[in-house]
C-alpha cells in the first residue's frame, strides 16, 4: 500500500517538456577564397531539447542535434557523437544529457550540459565552460555542451557556483580547406594538412560567487583548466612541402569578475579576466569588456569596448583566438522589435585594422515558421583578425520551423 | 441589530471615501498566499494582425511583497523563456529574464521597464506589483457604481499618474488609464469578472497601447489561488532549472 502510494505520488509529479526546431540556412558568399571556391553553403539543423521531471526534485534533461550540409562541414557517418571533440561537425551529437537535482537552496546538474558565465553580451572573458563551434563562421558561433558536474548554492542574493569538468571539450575550429581558415600568404605553395588534435587529459574546475544587491550585481570567479581555443604545432616536411598542423590546448588559469550597475539612463556592464598558463611559451593576457546598454521603446542598444593586454607573448604565433581577435574593438548591437512578429538587428565590431557589420531582419509566420535574412560585411587588412576574413562577406537566409 | 454594529455602519461610507483605504480594501479582498494560471495572449496590431502567445504564471506571497515566475509555453520558438519578478514593499521590483536558447539570464534594469514585454502590450513595469504605500491617492469622482481614483507613484515609474476605476460592490478594478507627462500611454480593462475561491477575479485583461494602437487580450485559464508552493521555486536557480 505504501509502495503504491509512493509510486502514485511519483507518477503524479512527472511532467514532460520539449522544444525544438528544424532550420535550413543558406549562406551565399559573393567572393571565393584561395582555399575555398564555393559560393553557396546550405546547412540543415534539427535540434530537440527535452526534460522529464521524474520527481519534484529530480529532472532528466536531453538535447540532441542532427545536421547535414552541402560543404562537407559535417562528417558523413552514422554515429552519435557524445563529446563533440571531432574536427568536422558530427551529424548526430548530444548537446545535453544530464540529471538536475534540487533540494532547498542547492541545485546540482550532472552530465552533459551548457554552462554560461559572465554578464556582458558582446564578449565574455569569464565564460570558460562554454566552448563554441566556429567551424562555419567566426562571427556567428553556436555554443557546445560540456560534460561536467555543477553544484549551485543560492541564498538570498548570494550564489556560489562550483563546476568540475572531467573531460575536455574544445571549441570547434574552421576546417583548414575552407574559407574561415585563412592561410597566410607566406605559406603559399605549402600543402597544409590537418593532423588532428592532442587533447589534454586532466580535468577542469572553477568557482564563481555572485552577489545581487538592490539594483546591481557583481561576481568573482576562478577557473583552472585548459584553453578551449587551440594553438597549432607545425610539422614541416621540406621534401614534400607539407605542413601538418596539430591542435594543442595550453593549460589556462583565470581570475575574473563581472558587474552590472544600472545608472540613471544606462546600464553599465563590465567583465574582465586575467589568464595565466603553466604551459611553456603560452600567452598570458588580460581581456576586459566595458558595455553600456539601454532600451528605448522598441529599440535596444548595447555598445562598448573590448580590450586586451598581453603580459607574456606567445612563443607560438599560430593560434586560433577569436576572443583576442575581437578585443581592441568598439562593438555595438542594436535591435528593433517592429511588432509582435518582426524584428530587426544590427551588430558591428570596429578595430583599427578591420571591421564587421551585420544586418538581420526576422519575421515570424503563424505559430511555427520564422524567416531570417541577413547581410554581413567584413572589411580590413590581411594582418588583422577581422580583416583577414574580408573575402567572407555574405548574405544568408534561414527558414526555421519550431515545434 | 447589536449596539456595536451601529457606529461601525455609520462610519463605513466615510471610511470608504478615503482612496487609500479603498485600495487597501481591494488588496485585502484579493489577498491570496499564492496564485497560478495559464494565460493566452492575443496581440492585435494596428493592422489587425494577430499573434498568439501562451504563458504560465505562478506567484507566491502577498500583494506587493511577492515573487512570481512567468514562463512562455507558446509559440514554440519562445517556449521556456521566463521572467522572475521579485516584488518589494518599499521599492520597485527586481526582474530577470531567462532565455534558454542562449543559457543566459538578463537583469531588467529599472530604466528599461517601460519596454514592451516580449512583443506584448504589457511593459515590464506592468507585470510588477507595487505596494499601496508606493503611491499617493486622490479620490476624483464617485461615479455611481465605481470610484475614480488618481494614483501618483512616489518612486521612479514610466507613468506620471494613473486613473483607477474600482467597482463599489466588490472592490475590483474595472479600468486603469496610465499617463506619462506627455499624455495617455496605456489603458487596461478588466473584464468577465467572476468569483474564484471566494476572490473576485477578472478572466480577461485587455491592454491597449495608445502610441502603437496595439491591443493585447490576456485570457486567464486554470486559475487557482492558495495552492501549496515553495519559496525555493521562485529563485534565479528555479528560473534556470526549467527547460
For the regions a language model picked out, list residue spans one by one.
Chain B
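Short, flexible active-site-adjacent loop segments at beta-strand->alpha-helix junctions, enriched
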Residues: 89, 101, 111-112, 136
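Short, ordered beta-strand-loop transition motifs
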Residues: 60-66, 139-146, 196-197
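Sec-dependent signal peptide recognition
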Residues: 1-8
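N-terminal mature ectodomain segment of secretory-pathway/periplasmic proteins
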Residues: 18-100
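Short structured motifs
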Residues: 21-24, 40, 53-56, 133-139, ...
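Hydrophobic h-region of N-terminal signal peptides that target proteins for export
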Residues: 8-16
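Gly/Pro-enriched, hydrophobic low-complexity segments
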Residues: 16, 24, 73, 84, ...
Amino acid at each position: 500500500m505504501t509502495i503504491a502510494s509512493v509510486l502514485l505520488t511519483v507518477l503524479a509529479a512527472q511532467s514532460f517538456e520539449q522544444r525544438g526546431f528544424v532550420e535550413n540556412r543558406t549562406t551565399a558568399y559573393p567572393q571565393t577564397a584561395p582555399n575555398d571556391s564555393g559560393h553557396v553553403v546550405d546547412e540543415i539543423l534539427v535540434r530537440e531539447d527535452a526534460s522529464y521531471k521524474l520527481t519534484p526534485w529530480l529532472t532528466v534533461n536531453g538535447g540532441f542535434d542532427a545536421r547535414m550540409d552541402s560543404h562537407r562541414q559535417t562528417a558523413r557517418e552514422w554515429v552519435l557523437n557524445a563529446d563533440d571533440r571531432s574536427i568536422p561537425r558530427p551529424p548526430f551529437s548530444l548537446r545535453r544529457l544530464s540529471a538536475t537535482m534540487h533540494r532547498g537552496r542547492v541545485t546540482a546538474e550532472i552530465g552533459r550540459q551548457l554552462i554560461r558565465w559572465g554578464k556582458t553580451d558582446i564578449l565574455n572573458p569569464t565564460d570558460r565552460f562554454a566552448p563554441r563551434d566556429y567551424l562555419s563562421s567566426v562571427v556567428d558561433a553556436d555554443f557546445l555542451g560540456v560534460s561536467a558536474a555543477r553544484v549551485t548554492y543560492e541564498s538570498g542574493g548570494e550564489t556560489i557556483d562550483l563546476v568540475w569538468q572531467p573531460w575536455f571539450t574544445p571549441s570547434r575550429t574552421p576546417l583548414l580547406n575552407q574559407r574561415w581558415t585563412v592561410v597566410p600568404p607566406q605559406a603559399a605553395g605549402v600543402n597544409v594538412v590537418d593532423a588532428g588534435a592532442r587533447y589534454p587529459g586532466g580535468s577542469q574546475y572553477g568557482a564563481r560567487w555572485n552577489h545581487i544587491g538592490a539594483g546591481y550585481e557583481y561576481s568573482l570567479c576562478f577557473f583552472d583548466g585548459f584553453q578551449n581555443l587551440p594553438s597549432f604545432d607545425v610539422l614541416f616536411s621540406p621534401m614534400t612541402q607539407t605542413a601538418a598542423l596539430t591542435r594543442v590546448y595550453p593549460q589556462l588559469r583565470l581570475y575574473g569578475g563581472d558587474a552590472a550597475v544600472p545608472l540613471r539612463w544606462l546600464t553599465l556592464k563590465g567583465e574582465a579576466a586575467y589568464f595565466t598558463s603553466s604551459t611553456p611559451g603560452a600567452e598570458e593576457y588580460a581581456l576586459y569588456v566595458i558595455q553600456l546598454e539601454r532600451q528605448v521603446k522598441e529599440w535596444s542598444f548595447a555598445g562598448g569596448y573590448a580590450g586586451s593586454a598581453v603580459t607574456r607573448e606567445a612563443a607560438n604565433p599560430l593560434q586560433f583566438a577569436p576572443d583576442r581577435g575581437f578585443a581592441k574593438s568598439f562593438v555595438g548591437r542594436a535591435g528593433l522589435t517592429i511588432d509582435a512578429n518582426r524584428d530587426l538587428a544590427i551588430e558591428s565590431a570596429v578595430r583599427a585594422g578591420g571591421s564587421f557589420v551585420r544586418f538581420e531582419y526576422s519575421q515570424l509566420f503563424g505559430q511555427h515558421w520564422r524567416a531570417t535574412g541577413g547581410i554581413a560585411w567584413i572589411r580590413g587588412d590581411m594582418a588583422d583578425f577581422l580583416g583577414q576574413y574580408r573575402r567572407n562577406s555574405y548574405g544568408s537566409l534561414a527558414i526555421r520551423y519550431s515545434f | 441589530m447589536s449596539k456595536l454594529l451601529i457606529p461601525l455602519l455609520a462610519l463605513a461610507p466615510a471610511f470608504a471615501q478615503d482612496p487609500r483605504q479603498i485600495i487597501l480594501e481591494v488588496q485585502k479582498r484579493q489577498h491570496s498566499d499564492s496564485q497560478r494560471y495559464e494565460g493566452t495572449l492575443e496581440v492585435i496590431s494596428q493592422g489587425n494582425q494577430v499573434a498568439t502567445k501562451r504563458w504560465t504564471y505562478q506567484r507566491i506571497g502577498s500583494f506587493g511583497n511577492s515573487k512570481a515566475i512567468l514562463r512562455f509555453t507558446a509559440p514554440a520558438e519562445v517556449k521556456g523563456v521566463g521572467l522572475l519578478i521579485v516584488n518589494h514593499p518599499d521599492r520597485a521590483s527586481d526582474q530577470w529574464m531567462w532565455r534558454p536558447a542562449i543559457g543566459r539570464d538578463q537583469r531588467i534594469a529599472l530604466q528599461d521597464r517601460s519596454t514592451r514585454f516580449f512583443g506584448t502590450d504589457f511593459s515590464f513595469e506592468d507585470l510588477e506589483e507595487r505596494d499601496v504605500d508606493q503611491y499617493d491617492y486622490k479620490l476624483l469622482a464617485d461615479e455611481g457604481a465605481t470610484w475614480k481614483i488618481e494614483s501618483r507613484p512616489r518612486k521612479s515609474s514610466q507613468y506620471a499618474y494613473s486613473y483607477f476605476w474600482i467597482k463599489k460592490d466588490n472592490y475590483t478594478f474595472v479600468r486603469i488609464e496610465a499617463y506619462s507627462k506627455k499624455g495617455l500611454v496605456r489603458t487596461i480593462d478588466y473584464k468577465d469578472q467572476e468569483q474564484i475561491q471566494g476572490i473576485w477575479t477578472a478572466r480577461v485583461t485587455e491592454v491597449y497601447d495608445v502610441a502603437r494602437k496595439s491591443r493585447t487580450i490576456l485570457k486567464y485559464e486554470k486559475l487557482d489561488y492558495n495552492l501549496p508552493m515553495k519559496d525555493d521555486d521562485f529563485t534565479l536557480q528555479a528560473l534556470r532549472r526549467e527547460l
